[in-house]
């Protein structure tokens, strides 16, 4: 998600974020039953993919917020693909894996020994005191287009919200559509949708959760958000 903020800087602030469309989809999965709280991660090996991206920075933020040093108290080993994380978990029953939805659901359906130990998204919300949330995706638009076609943009946003409401209220029908279009199997989609954090959040609420999230990333590495935090013009309001 932080790439949108980088785009904001690279385009000389020619884009705005209309809404948050996906919150956190990251979960800590284990092959066992030893992790009940974030404190139980101390001394563990955590397998993950996404080095230099949201998974790494989100994990580090949650660990640090709970008094765990990512470099000293845990061993984080990055893999190139999610499937490699699952393979590592199968071989190392003392380890934990950081995986996103819907891959979590796929992995659990294929291996009944795996289980979700912790919800990184909830850990983020419990650990941060700035009203931020773990943001995975946003809707952006070119500012010139927004200014020239404000009515169309607002119609699009209304339709987008209706689509989100439909997916979350009728997961079976939504999963059927997803399966019919060969995105992922219907069975996987139906189980995964409730944990995919599909949302439509705009206005002040969007600004609060997104600005806090970007500030947390900025504390770790300003370069990943383009070197500086965005100004208020980055957040579209209608």
Task: Walk through the language-model features, giving the residues of each.
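Secondary-structure end/capping motifs
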Residues: 146-220
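Short, glycine-/small- and polar/acidic-enriched structural segments
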Residues: 3-68, 78, 95, 101, ...
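Pocket-lining segment of extracytoplasmic ligand-binding domains
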Residues: 3, 77, 81-177
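Sec/Tat-exported extracytoplasmic proteins
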Residues: 8-11, 42-45, 50, 63-67, ...
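Conserved C-terminal helix/tail region of periplasmic/extracytoplasmic solute-binding proteins
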Residues: 211-238
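Short, surface-exposed acidic
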Residues: 70-74, 182-194, 225-231
């Amino acid at each position: 998600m932080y790439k949108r903020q980088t785009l904001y800087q690279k385009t000389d602030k020619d884009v705005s974020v209309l809404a948050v469309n996906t919150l956190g989809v990251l979960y800590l999965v284990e092959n066992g039953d030893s992790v009940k709280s974030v404190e139980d991660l101390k001394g563990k090996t955590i397998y993950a993919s996404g080095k230099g991206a949201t998974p790494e920075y989100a994990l580090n933020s949650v660990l640090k917020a709970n008094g765990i040093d990512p470099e000293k108290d845990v061993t984080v080993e990055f893999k190139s693909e999610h499937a490699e994380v699952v393979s590592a978990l199968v071989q190392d029953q003392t380890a934990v894996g950081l995986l996103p939805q819907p891959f979590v659901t796929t992995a659990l359906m294929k291996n009944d020994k795996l289980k979700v130990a912790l919800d990184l998204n909830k850990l983020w919300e419990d650990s941060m005191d700035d009203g931020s949330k773990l943001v995975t995706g946003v809707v952006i638009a070119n500012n010139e287009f927004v200014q020239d076609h404000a009515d169309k943009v607002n119609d699009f946003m209304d339709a987008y919200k209706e689509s989100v409401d439909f997916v979350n209220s009728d997961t079976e029908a939504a999963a059927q559509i997803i399966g019919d279009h060969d995105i992922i199997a219907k069975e996987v989609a139906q189980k995964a949708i409730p944990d995919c954090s599909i949302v439509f959040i705009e206005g002040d609420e969007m600004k609060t959760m997104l600005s806090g999230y970007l500030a947390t990333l900025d504390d770790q590495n300003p370069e990943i958000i383009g070197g500086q935090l965005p100004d208020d013009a980055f957040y579209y309001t209608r």
